[in-house]
Amino acid sequence: MSSTEEKFSLKEVLVSFKSCLVDDDQDIIVEQYLNGWKGLVRFMNSLGTIFSFVSKDAVTKIQIMENYLAGTNGERYRTLQSMVEHELSSDLVDLTKRCNNPDSGCRTILRLHRALRWLQLFLEKLRTSNEDSKTSTLCTEAYNDSLANFHPWIIRKTATVAFLALPTRNTFFEVMNVGTTEEVVAMLGESMPYVTKVYDFTHEIYSQHNLLELP
């Protein structure tokens, strides 16, 4: 069983994203970021194929980044800041078109970053919702406020139709393998600030270097 097929654990995701942040929250350890994402992939896969349009792409992006970490310049990819500095100084990032370096680390992390925003919004909505809330509505709202802005119409339409098949809030909480509803809500409350910090810091670094619209 691969690392993305194991049973989902919300606590492991919390630990990974908490461990991401170093140097007084001024940098991100890429390996821990990827570990957090592996946990999120397990979360999506545990719900069947509904989120496969995101999870499959995330698995591909994780593999690209792990190849960079294992490569000859792996140390340059250890943190987010060192990766950005290395790729920009080495002309590995094309800000105008994709053809030259389609799989740069900067572009790859950006795609994960955009998807993280959707999951961040959705999980926060789940945390603050009530038992009768429609998860399809919560997920669609989160999607429309994030990933939908980067998807063509056909994918947006397919995604929102797929969301209609989402299970109940209680089923989502059971998948998280934490315990009672109250315990899940409490752990989400502990986890989401770290996910938000990681997202916000990544967004800030990419904004500083004009990387948020990489093709």
Curated annotation (Swiss-Prot):
Q: Which UniProt keywords apply?
A: Cell membrane, Cytoplasm, Endosome, Golgi apparatus, Lipid transport, Lipid-binding, Membrane, Nucleus, Transport
Q: List the disulfide bonds.
A: none
Family matches, as InterPro entries: GLTP_sf, Glycolipid_transfer_prot_dom
Membrane topology, record value: Peripheral membrane protein
Q: Name one GO biological process term.
A: negative regulation of interleukin-1 beta production
Q: For binding an N-acylsphingoid base 1-phosphate, which residues are annotated in this chain's numbering?
A: D57, K61, R107, R111, H151
Q: Which GO terms describe its molecular function?
A: ceramide 1-phosphate binding; ceramide 1-phosphate transfer activity; phospholipid binding
Single GO cellular component term = nuclear outer membrane
- Any one Pfam family match given in the protein's UniProt record, by short name: GLTP
From the UniProt record, list the reaction(s) this protein catalyses: N-(hexadecanoyl)-sphing-4-enine-1-phosphate(in) = N-(hexadecanoyl)-sphing-4-enine-1-phosphate(out); N-(9Z-octadecenoyl)-sphing-4-enine-1-phosphate(in) = N-(9Z-octadecenoyl)-sphing-4-enine-1-phosphate(out)
Subcellular location field: Cytoplasm, Cytosol; Golgi apparatus, trans-Golgi network membrane; Cell membrane; Endosome membrane
Its family remark reads: Belongs to the GLTP family.
Q: What does this protein do?
A: Mediates the intracellular transfer of ceramide-1-phosphate (C1P) between organelle membranes and the cell membrane. Required for normal structure of the Golgi stacks. Can bind phosphoceramides with a variety of aliphatic chains, but has a preference for lipids with saturated C16:0 or monounsaturated C18:1 aliphatic chains, and is inefficient with phosphoceramides containing lignoceryl (C24:0). Plays a role in the regulation of the cellular levels of ceramide-1-phosphate, and thereby contributes to the regulation of phospholipase PLA2G4A activity and the release of arachidonic acid.
The protein in question is named Ceramide-1-phosphate transfer protein
Organism from which the protein derives:
Xenopus tropicalis (Western clawed frog)
**Gene name linked to the record:** cptp
